[in-house]
């Protein structure tokens, strides 16, 4: 019913998740080839991730000597969540790790805001800038204004398709009208923008058109992973050359399934 307070006894469950993993899970379900280029570190959380990857036959592309972090997800009765995060190996990239990638084998790349927040040496941004053929999907998340501004602008100038919710785009653009906020962000990115609106669906904007796609009615149990499943579906559908209206209808359908159950994945 509420966030925990003094002397509360809280039941905990440990499960694997995270933005990139949740997106990869959707891609896998939709038979879309992908590589999960995410560091796996040490410690109890690193061991937990490593065991899960082995069970699911997910290749570990990066082994880090740093400890893995974790994220406490507190979910209230309405399904809304609060995150308490300890950033670990999964958020810190090294330039040499990208040497194993042949960028010509890829068409699309998904980037989460948390990685960019910790990308102090800008190795992720440098890789993306070096391969302009890649279509970038960027989900900055609620930490959009915590990312160092100069670093964030470097990424936005690479023309990513930005995926964020209404509160996030309002806070970033300092606007309170959705179409004006999208127009403001578009002036920077010059690429499509998708804004998720919770129970009201989502909104698409580019220089030629804008439209609203209604949500699928469902009973909300847990909103963890809703945005990840939405952008994951978009990436999978666009890789199959699906048009934007149909793509967003499908994304809303998958997101509604995710929020109707406990956990961040289907």
Language-model segments: what does each one mean?
Residues 1-37, 48, 220-221:
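Glycine-rich phosphate/adenosyl-contacting loop at the front of the ribokinase-like
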Residues 2, 178-266:
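Conserved phosphate-binding/catalytic region of the ribokinase-like
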Residues 30, 66-69, 198:
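Short, basic and Ser/Thr-rich N-terminal targeting/leader segments
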Residues 37, 84, 213-214:
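Hydrophobic residues at beta-strand termini and immediately following loops
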Residues 39-41:
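Alpha-helical transmembrane segments within multi-pass membrane transporters and channels
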Residues 51-63, 76-210:
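Ribokinase/PfkB-type carbohydrate-kinase core domain
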Residues 72:
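C-terminal catalytic lobe of FAD-dependent flavoproteins
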């Amino acid at each position: 019913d509420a966030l925990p307070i003094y002397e509360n006894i809280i039941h905990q469950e440990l499960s694997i998740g995270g933005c990139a993993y949740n997106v990869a899970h959707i891609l896998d379900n939709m038979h879309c080839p992908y590589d999960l280029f995410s560091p796996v570190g040490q410690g109890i959380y690193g061991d937990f991730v490593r065991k899960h990857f082995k069970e699911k036959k997910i290749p570990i592309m990066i082994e880090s000597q740093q400890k893995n972090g974790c994220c406490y997800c507190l979910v209230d009765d309405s399904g809304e969540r609060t995150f308490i995060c300890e950033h670990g190996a999964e958020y810190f990239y090294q330039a040499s790790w990208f040497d194993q990638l042949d960028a010509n084998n890829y068409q699309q790349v998904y980037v989460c805001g948390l990685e960019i927040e910790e990308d102090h040496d800008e190795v992720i941004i440098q890789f993306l800038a070096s391969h302009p053929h890649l279509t970038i999907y960027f989900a900055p998340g609620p930490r959009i204004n915590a990312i160092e501004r100069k670093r964030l602008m470097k990424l936005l100038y690479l023309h990513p398709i930005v995926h964020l919710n209404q509160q996030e785009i309002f806070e970033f653009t300092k606007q309170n009208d959705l179409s004006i906020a999208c127009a403001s962000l578009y002036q920077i990115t010059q690429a499509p923008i998708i804004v998720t609106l919770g129970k009201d669906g989502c909104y698409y904007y580019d220089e030629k058109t804008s439209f609203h796609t209604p949500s699928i009615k469902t009973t909300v149990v847990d909103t963890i992973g809703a945005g990840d499943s939405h952008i994951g579906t978009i990436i999978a559908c666009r890789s199959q050359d699906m048009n934007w209206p149909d793509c967003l209808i499908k994304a809303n359908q998958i997101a509604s399934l995710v929020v109707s159950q406990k956990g961040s994945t289907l």
